[in-house]
Amino acid sequence: MKIQTLGFDWDSGNRRKCRKHGLHLVDIETFFRQSSLFVMPDIHHSRSEERHIAFGSSLKGRPMLVAFTFRIREEEVLIRPISARYMHEKEAKEYEKKGTEI
């Protein structure tokens, strides 16, 4: 089976969760198109599906994180954002510290 390139899977639920934290769809889609993301499994929330957390920065340089999973629709792998937000100050400092160690 041939799998096409990534797209995004949006519905009213995940749009609402992301907007709640001041982020728009374009912010999140742009975030995933960057090459400087750090992605790790979200083992605490992966009971019914495999979830991941991506750490990186917005185009304006503001640290943010996105919880997401993958969905396959019509042989295309889609990124399904679950929630997205800007990092809290403590998280951002930890991310910056770890980023220098990678």
Where in the sequence are the language-model features?
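Ribonuclease/tRNase effector modules and their secretory precursors
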Residues: M1-I102
